[in-house]
């Protein structure tokens, strides 16, 4: 009897766990259907062979992004990669339900093989304060030198700090003391295209054909169903979700590619790159010794010149 009770209890708990997992995307759409989850699920590598970061496939507007890293770092040292995502904090974006809300931001940092997130016990108190409330994770198990963050509130995180641990060539034979490229992509606001290829409600809707707008029907959710009679006589239906505002009226003639709504998008995506040098401690010490030798030689040369001038002056007086 007791065994049957335990078995039933285990089955019930398993059913609850499965139900929660299935309902999570519905209860938390902003967390699931947001950058960078789309990219992680759809692309093995976020940077295409052309150099373009795949986030640009959904975030169509171009916006600036900046990255700052040290010019050179030593092996097994922690440094900051600072990503700047500037935008006007006064603007509001169209959310999934059509209302206006604040923008969120996200970023993907692509580092060379061997560079990893710095362990918490290696962070300084200042670094811990800068990264407080920001969850940074590897892109995937096979891409541990690519890091993603977001979506997070943009108002508090226009600057994102990535604490990075530099690799040591002595421990990793694939790492060398050379100059490496660093790539970054960052977005602010929602995308215009879903991974399925469908438009979101944060983009402009236009007429695919030339004709006449014969009917505008408002839906229960607040969107519109537009019926366009093409020049060939065939009716065409366009679904406009809640969010974009119409700029056309019923009975109006429209041309191909003519805007039917305003463009509600206020965000966008940007990418840039920089370089970082993994410095050899022996080379740095050798360079310091070389500079010290040069400076010492210059000092000795000046002293020798002064001594020679004094001897010449003494001989002239004699």
UniProtKB/Swiss-Prot annotation:
This protein's UniProt keywords: Chloroplast, Electron transport, Heme, Iron, Membrane, Metal-binding, Photosynthesis, Plastid, Signal, Thylakoid, Transmembrane, Transmembrane helix, Transport
One GO process term, biological-process aspect: photosynthesis
Pfam family, one: Apocytochr_F_N
The keyword Nucleotide-binding is assigned to this record: no
InterPro entries the UniProt entry points to: Cyt-f_TM, Cyt_f, Cyt_f_lg_dom, Cyt_f_lg_dom_sf, Rudment_hybrid_motif
Signal peptide: 1-34
HAMAP family linked: Cytb6_f_cytF
Name under which the protein is recorded: Cytochrome f
């Amino acid at each position: 009897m007791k065994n049957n009770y335990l078995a039933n209890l285990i089955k019930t708990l398993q059913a609850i766990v499965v139900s929660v997992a299935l309902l999570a995307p519905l209860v938390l759409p902003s967390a699931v259907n947001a950058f960078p989850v789309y990219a992680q699920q759809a692309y093995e590598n976020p940077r295409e062979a052309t150099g373009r970061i795949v986030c640009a496939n959904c975030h169509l507007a171009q916006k600036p992004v900046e990255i700052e890293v040290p010019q050179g770092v030593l092996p097994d040292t922690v440094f900051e990669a600072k990503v700047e995502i500037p935008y006007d904090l006064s603007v509001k974006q169209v959310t999934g339900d059509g209302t206006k809300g604040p923008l969120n931001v996200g970023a993907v940092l692509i580092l060379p093989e061997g560079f990893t997130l710095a362990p918490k016990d290696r962070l300084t108190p200042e670094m811990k304060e800068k990264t407080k409330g920001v969850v940074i994770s590897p892109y995937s198990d096979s891409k541990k030198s690519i890091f993603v963050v977001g979506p997070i509130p943009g108002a508090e995180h226009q600057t994102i700090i990535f604490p990075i641990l530099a690799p040591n060539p002595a421990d990793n034979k694939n790492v060398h003391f050379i100059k490496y490229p660093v790539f970054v992509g960052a977005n602010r606001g929602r995308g215009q295209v879903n991974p399925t290829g469908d438009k979101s409600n944060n983009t402009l809707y236009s007429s695919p054909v030339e004709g006449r707008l014969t009917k505008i029907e408002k839906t229960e959710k607040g969107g519109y169903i537009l019926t366009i009679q093409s020049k060939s006589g065939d009716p065409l239906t366009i679904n406009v979700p809640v969010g974009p505002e119409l700029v056309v009226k019923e009975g109006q003639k429209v041309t191909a590619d003519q805007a039917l709504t305003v463009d509600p998008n206020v965000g966008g995506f940007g990418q840039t790159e920089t370089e970082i040098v993994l410095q050899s401690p022996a080379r740095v010490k050798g360079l310091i010794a070389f500079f010290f030798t040069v400076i010492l030689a210059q000092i000795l040369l000046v002293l020798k010149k002064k001594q020679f001038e004094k001897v010449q002056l003494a001989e002239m007086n004699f």
